[in-house]
Each structure stands twice: as structure tokens, then as C-alpha cells.
């Protein structure tokens, strides 16, 4: 269901107009941030998500809704409702662990996603990295950051090994173990891109875990494991810069200390690797 109202409504207006029998249940839970909440009525539970990024155009939030509308129930929560500034999606009942599933399970989940029809919009990292630079705290801009950004822009993004729909924020807190199996939540960064970019961006603990995931995926997708790992490594500098820039971006938006700590740690990793 999609509303044509062009003026963003408050949460209370959304509830009274479209979900009059529902009440807020939990302030924050699975993949929620920026004023989103869980609402319920009897045994029915819905996630009400708010467009919380003031620097992102409304079209990005609409893409999030469209991605959920396209995906099968075996991968993601169902999209239920959209109006400018808000969407409602199915609440997934299940277990969320901070740790990733084992390599074979995660490879199967990602391969299932990558077999779906493309969303229709490409993920472009170069303009995103430039946006993070321009929107960050000017006091945080360093010559090192600018050099790395210009070097990546000069080299250009790696040529895709295989294009597919991507989630692009795969970590333990965004994976729900439901009665029907593993599913992914928080699809706001989804788009079409290289499967190796997705694998490069998974929030792994170390290189050993990363190699295990890459090998498991290669076996399932019938791709040469060495070729896939080389492609993942080509994307690695882009992904590290993406994470550092995102932490800086969120620090500027929220002022939350966790983001500045994560940004500092990511910059240290980049400097250690030259």
C-alpha cells in the first residue's frame, strides 16, 4: 500500500491515520534507528521506519521500500505501506545474534539474494565517498583522507565480476534466524553491484573468517575461489574508505562518540596498510 501524501507526517499522525488500532511496542530493536519504532495490535507486529537521514534525498528512502517490495519473503520482511518520510514493514520474529552465521549458511543466504532479479539502480561508491568527504566535520578532513579518495577516484571502481542485487550492510545484527531460516533486515543501502563488493563489505572478524566465506560462496556459485578472492581484495580499499567515511558522516549527524571511535580505528587500519 502506498500513500500519495507529499508532506511528511509525524509518527502520531501516521498511527492515527493509517494504523489506528496499533500502539508503539518497543522504542528500538532489529536494525532500527532515527525515530523508527515497532507497533503492535493483538498478535500483529509491524516495524514503522522513518526516513532519518537529512542529507539523503527522499528517492533513496523510496528505493528502500521498492527493494523490499521486490524481494521474496524467503529473504526479507514484506513491505506493507509507504508515505513520504515513512514506511511500514513486516516484523520478523526470530533470533538476532551479533555474530555472523557460519560460512556455509551465510554464503547460501547471499547466493540466494544474488540470484534474484536486479533492483534497477546501481551502487556507485565514488560519488558516495565524495559525499562523505563534503558532509563530514571540516576539522576531521585530513590530507591522508583526501589522498586516498583521489587515488581511488583516479583508479576507478573495479570491473564487476558478476552483477546482482546487493544488501551492502551484512552483519550479525541485520540477520534474523526465523522459523523459515535466515533473513536479512535493514535494506537501506541496497542496490545492484558486483557480488564481490557485497562479500568485501561483510562485517567479518578477521581475514580467516573472510576467506572461509569467500570459499563457501565460490563453491556454491561455481566461481573459481582464487578469482573471487582477488576481486574481493580489489574492492577492499573502497570498502574500508566507505566505512571510514560513513562513520565520519554519522558522527557529524549525531555527535555520538561511538562513531568517532570507529572512524579513528578505521583510519588507523588504513594507515597501517599504507
From Swiss-Prot:
Keyword terms: ATP-binding, Kinase, Nucleotide-binding, Transferase
Cross-referenced SUPFAM superfamilies: Protein kinase-like (PK-like)
InterPro entries (UniProt xref): Aminoglycoside_PTrfase (IPR002575), Kinase-like_dom_sf (IPR011009), Thiamine_kinase (IPR014093)
Example of a GO biological process term: thiamine metabolic process
Catalytic activity: thiamine + ATP = thiamine phosphate + ADP + H(+)
Pathway: Cofactor biosynthesis; thiamine diphosphate biosynthesis; thiamine phosphate from thiamine: step 1/1
Domain of life, source organism: Bacteria
Listed EC numbers: 2.7.1.89
Recorded GO MF terms: ATP binding; thiamine kinase activity
Family: Belongs to the thiamine kinase family.
HAMAP family given in the database record: Thiamine_kinase (MF_01604)
Protein function: Catalyzes the ATP-dependent phosphorylation of thiamine to thiamine phosphate. Is involved in thiamine salvage.
Record's protein name: Thiamine kinase
Organism encoding this protein: Salmonella schwarzengrund (strain CVM19633)
Gene: thiK
Amino acid at each position: 500500500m502506498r500513500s500519495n501524501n507529499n508532506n511528511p507526517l509525524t509518527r502520531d499522525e501516521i498511527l492515527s491515520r493509517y494504523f489506528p488500532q496499533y500502539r508503539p511496542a518497543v522504542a528500538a530493536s532489529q536494525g532500527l534507528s532515527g525515530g523508527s519504532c515497532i507497533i503492535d495490535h493483538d498478535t500483529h507486529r509491524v516495524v514503522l521506519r522513518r526516513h532519518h537521514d537529512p542529507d539523503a534525498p527522499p528517492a533513496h528512502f523510496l528505493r528502500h521500500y521498492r527493494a523490499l517490495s521486490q524481494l521474496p519473503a524467503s529473504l526479507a520482511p514484506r513491505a506493507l505501506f509507504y508515505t513520504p518520510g515513512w514506511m511500514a514493514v513486516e516484523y520478523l520474529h526470530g533470533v538476532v545474534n551479533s555474530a555472523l552465521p557460519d560460512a556455509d549458511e551465510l554464503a547460501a543466504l547471499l547466493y540466494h539474494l544474488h540470484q534474484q532479479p536486479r533492483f534497477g539502480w546501481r551502487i556507485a561508491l565514488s560519488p558516495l565517498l565524495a559525499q562523505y568527504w563534503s558532509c563530514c566535520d571540516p576539522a576531521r578532513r585530513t590530507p591522508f583522507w583526501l589522498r586516498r579518495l583521489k587515488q581511488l577516484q583516479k583508479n576507478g571502481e573495479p570491473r564487476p565480476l558478476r552483477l546482482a542485487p546487493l544488501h551492502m550492510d551484512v552483519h550479525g545484527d541485520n540477520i534474523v534466524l526465523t522459523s523459515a531460516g535466515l533473513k536479512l533486515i535493514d535494506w537501506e543501502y541496497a542496490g545492484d553491484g558486483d557480488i564481490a563488493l557485497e562479500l568485501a563489505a561483510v562485517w567479518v572478524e578477521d581475514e580467516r573468517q573472510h576467506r572461509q566465506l569467500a570459499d563457501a560462496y565460490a563453491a556454491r556459485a561455481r566461481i573459481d575461489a582464487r578469482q573471487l578472492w582477488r576481486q574481493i581484495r580489489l574492492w577492499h580499499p573502497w570498502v574500508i574508505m566507505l566505512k571510514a567515511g560513513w562513520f565520519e558522516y554519522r558522527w557529524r549527524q549525531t555527535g555520538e562518540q561511538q562513531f568517532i571511535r570507529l572512524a579513528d580505528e578505521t583510519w588507523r587500519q588504513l594507515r597501517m596498510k599504507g
